[in-house]
UniProtKB/Swiss-Prot annotation:
It catalyses: L-glutamyl-tRNA(Gln) + L-glutamine + ATP + H2O = L-glutaminyl-tRNA(Gln) + L-glutamate + ADP + phosphate + H(+); L-aspartyl-tRNA(Asn) + L-glutamine + ATP + H2O = L-asparaginyl-tRNA(Asn) + L-glutamate + ADP + phosphate + 2 H(+). Heterotrimer of A, B and C subunits. Pfam families: GatC. Keywords: ATP-binding, Ligase, Nucleotide-binding, Protein biosynthesis. It comes from Anaeromyxobacter sp. (strain Fw109-5). Its EC number is 6.3.5.-. This is Aspartyl/glutamyl-tRNA(Asn/Gln) amidotransferase subunit C. NCBIfam families: gatC. Disulfide bonds: none annotated. GO terms for molecular function: asparaginyl-tRNA synthase (glutamine-hydrolyzing) activity; ATP binding; glutaminyl-tRNA synthase (glutamine-hydrolyzing) activity. Belongs to the GatC family.
Length: 95
């Protein structure tokens, strides 16, 4: 599957990414290659393969929580599309 530059621009806009024309061309090729690979995987016959919920039999290894310093507010909000004081502004989804 080959993505068009318009499709790459739409995906970038949804992800709130600004891409240069060169990056758009690069990502169009890379994303197309990924989609081609996924299409190949979709063609495989996996009817005899037992479903699994996790790649590791023992599950996800855990580790103890560790308290570490966070980012300063200005650094955390540096790439926010909208902010109010030291808070992120997000679209209202519940009335």
């Amino acid at each position: 599957m080959s993505l068009t530059l318009d499709e790459v621009r739409r995906i970038a806009a949804l992800a709130r990414l600004r891409l240069s024309p060169e990056e758009e061309r690069t990502f169009a090729g890379q994303l197309s290659a990924i989609l081609d690979h996924v299409a190949q995987l979709a063609e495989l016959d996996v009817s005899g393969v037992e479903p699994m919920t996790h790649a590791l039999a023992e599950g996800v290894p855990s580790r103890p929580d560790e308290v570490r310093p966070g980012l300063p507010p200005e650094e955390a909000l540096a790439n926010a599309p909208a902010r109010e004081g030291t808070f992120f502004v997000v679209p209202r989804i519940i009335e």
